[in-house]
Amino acid sequence: MSDAAVDTSSEITTKDLKEKKEVVEEAENGRDAPANGNAQNEENGEQEADNEVDEEEEEGGEEEEEEEEGDGEEEDGDEDEEAEAPTGKRVAEDDEDDDVETKKQKKTDEDD
């Protein structure tokens, strides 16, 4: 059993050394390590960055298409309801506070 543990730790160390070596090589070549911390070759890093940009553009494009395809009234109606809901709750909370203050004032007035 102890042999397996030693083998596993040596594999991790080798992997770490390879990653550090790649990072050092990239730094020497004037390239920074990828932001995600994974040392990758230049081609893979560029492909991943391009894919992330494409996904963001696609997501933004889909939202615009949905707005154009659907009736604006339905979507706007939902948004208005959501916007009004928190405001209504705040008003209700304020009313409760006012009631408490009014009761306190009445008690004070009665005592005088």
From Swiss-Prot:
Main localisation: nucleus
GO molecular function: DNA-binding transcription factor binding; histone binding; histone chaperone activity
Native source species: Rattus norvegicus
Region annotated Disordered, chain positions: 1-112
Annotated function: Prothymosin alpha may mediate immune function by conferring resistance to certain opportunistic infections.
Lineage, top ranks: Eukaryota, Metazoa, Chordata, Craniata, Vertebrata
Listed name of the protein: Prothymosin alpha
GTP-binding recorded as keyword: no
Any Gene Ontology biological process: positive regulation of NF-kappaB transcription factor activity
Keywords: Acetylation, Isopeptide bond, Nucleus, Phosphoprotein, Ubl conjugation
List of residues that carry N-acetylmethionine: 1
